[in-house]
Amino acid sequence: MAEAHQASSLLSSLSSDGAEVELSSPVWQEIYLCALRSWKRHLWRVWNDFLAGVVPATPLSWLFLFSTIQLACLLQLDPSLGLMEKIKELLPDWGGQHHQLQGFLSAAVFASCLWGALIFTLHVALRLLLSHHGWLLEPHGAMSSPTKTWLALVRIFSGRHPRLFSFQRALPRQPVPSAQETVRKYLESVRPVLGDDAFDRATALANDFLRLHAPRLQLYLQLKSWCTSNYVSDWWEEFVYLRSRGSLINSTYYMMDFLYVTPTPLQAARAGNAVHTLLLYRHLLNRQEISPTLLMGMRPLCSAQYERMFNTTRIPGVEKDHLRHLQDSRHVAVFHRGRFFRVGTHSPNGLLSPRALEQQFQDILDDPSPACPLEEHLAALTAAPRSMWAQVRESVKTHAATALEAVEGAAFFVSLDSEPAGLTREDPAASLDAYAHALLAGRGHDRWFDKSFTLIVFSNGKLGLSVEHSWADCPVSGHLWEFTLATECFQLGYATDGHCKGHPDPTLPQPQRLQWDLPEQIQPSISLALRGAKTLSGNIDCHVFPFSHFGKSFIKCCHVSSDSFIQLVLQLAHFRDRGQFCLTYESAMTRLFLEGRTETVRSCTREACQFVRAMDNKETDQHCLALFRVAVDKHQALLKAAMSGQGIDRHLFALYIMSRLLHMQSPFLTQVQSQQWLLSTSQVPVQQTHLIDVHNYPDYVSSGGGFGPAHDHGYGISYIFMGENAITFHISSKKSSTETDSHRLGQHIENALLDVASLFRVGQHFKRQFRGENSDYRYNFLSCKTVDPNTPTSSTNL
């Protein structure tokens, strides 16, 4: 009966890519509407690119310049010094009656040329200003006079209201560091983790590399940097992500909802508001009305990663994947209880309202129809090894091209999960761990991992985001997520009964059920992929805990960098957990440069190891604190060097790829690329949009996100500063490893936080007050901070 109902609804209305079109509607009218939408999008794109390209100037500045030239001509002055007369000679001779028109056109041409020359000069000046990185080396909060002058000039040349891509033409290219300096830094970074003999061998290989291979490789790499936008980012995307043949579960990352608040317990309502907000963000993105991100409020960052946020799918290949990006998509693909649906997001009048989208999602939740044969676990193929999925996809494309296109051509993927998630009072620790695990891997078959991101809506109204990593890094998707949470909760809000605001639309067609007419021959492949996905998912040990005894405000009182503070805490905790030091990966962004992505900060330094050993030997607080400050200064120097394009690993990676392309065998570069990161760390950015006042609404903050470990015997750790007085850690490891335990490391991190804080006079009470307490104290503060999830919130009652 359900299939017959879907068939009848399909006969009554067909869904184009956006508007619902009745069969009786004239075909030429639909062609006209589609063409009109396409031309509107094209014109808007051209206009927005023009506005972004002329920043810091505006079209009004051209009009002012043209008017000034016309006024000068009326006063018998020639501001062009004879150039306008030359332009008149090049114009057609229309007779004496058109002499004024010739003067008008020559003035317009001269004004345009002068305007373009001024804009070009401003862009060159801004690029020179943005190439300066001396401000990074200054102590935080102590800005010198030259830096203040530089900042004032940057603000002047940046214009008043820059658009998202306004700075792309002015951003400098990422520099190629010196090979000698990179090798020196590399040897310095591995000294703490290598024995004497191993270090001597590494030094010998490095010297041979500098003598035999480095000059030629460096020359070719320098040539590449002159010919491309970024000398390493394209190779990083291709060889690290798109050529990786492993499961995407290993490289995705996730983002969580508000930790203490659930705006509505209604799954369909939360999905409606969230999808509407995401599409509002896409609308702003297409019109470039999102403000560019400014580091420390003054230095613009590259916005190139925003371009492939929506309408993007990673298409598997036998040897290499590729990213397919569409200019527009007017539907989302939805998964619920093993079934796929296509939900149109637009009507002829524009974007559907949140209430209309809620109605669509509620129809899906109420649909009792079973999954088609092979449909329920089909998405497990996207979690399979990429070469296997590429081969099976050809068969899927042959037999179910329409359904596959509906999923891959969607704006993004939505998963309506049948289970609740989020923090619970009954078992807060286990509930957070399960929440993280559900976002990272799901059940192996309920996420389409190829999509740029998947919006996950749980049965109790909790949200989450699962992000494919190749198209962008965490700060970019984090900006999207902050906007989504703030807008859907504070600006859109919910009615008192928990539904989206507005009224249902009885004329709205039902969602389109996708039909997968798949051959039985792919059943073994689906079963194999499902077993592999469940094995990978079941092997991930996730642990999330909020640390509430102190946060960023306390660390500020200690006059140290909050990120460096946490990195040294992690070194101390990991040493207590494993009894040894290891290569540590901390992600730093290189978006100060055009198309920059990330660089590695090797946080396990000689100075950090000296501090950790002093703490382990229980030396005096004064001595440990002195070593701590030295280690913090070293970490800050490494971080700033990485951000300014003087890091280690991306340069060595590019040299390695160049050596492979030139068929050169370098034992040194091979050894470097075979190194294992047993500790992979990252700080989750927060308050990029400034849409939520965390001081007045401290509960309305995301608890961040996390990722899987980079090694079978390693840890993946992310951390986020929640407001001023709490830190949330996300720890992951493999259950199959006998050397790691996420919960054990979490306890070491808590103890290390208290121990390091007690070194400072303002934090000495921490060690006395909390040492030896049961770890359940982490969640004791929830009783006074958790908001009842059954109480809907909206912008009005906030």
Swiss-Prot record:
Report any one BP term from Gene Ontology.
Answer: lipid metabolic process
TM segment ranges: 53-75, 104-126
Q: What is the effect of changing residue 589 to S?
A: Loss of binding to malonyl-CoA. Loss of regulation of SACM1L phosphatidylinositol-3-phosphatase activity. No effect on interaction with GRIA1
Active-site residues annotated for this sequence: 469
The UniProt record gives the binding positions of (R)-carnitine as 585, 587, 598
In which compartments does the protein localize?
Answer: Synapse; Cell projection, Axon; Cell projection, Dendrite; Cell projection, Dendritic spine
Please provide the record's free-text comment about the domains of this protein.
CPT1 enzymes are comprised of an N-terminal regulatory domain and a C-terminal catalytic domain that are separated by two transmembrane helices. In CPT1A, the regulatory domain, termed N, adopts a malonyl-CoA inhibitory and non-inhibitory state, Nalpha and Nbeta, respectively, which differ in their association with the catalytic domain.
Q: How does it assemble?
A: Peripherally associated with AMPAR complex. AMPAR complex consists of an inner core made of 4 pore-forming GluA/GRIA proteins (GRIA1, GRIA2, GRIA3 and GRIA4) and 4 major auxiliary subunits arranged in a twofold symmetry. One of the two pairs of distinct binding sites is occupied either by CNIH2, CNIH3 or CACNG2, CACNG3. The other harbors CACNG2, CACNG3, CACNG4, CACNG8 or GSG1L. This inner core of AMPAR complex is complemented by outer core constituents binding directly to the GluA/GRIA proteins at sites distinct from the interaction sites of the inner core constituents.
* Protein's name according to its UniProt entry: Palmitoyl thioesterase CPT1C
Gene encoding this polypeptide? Cpt1c
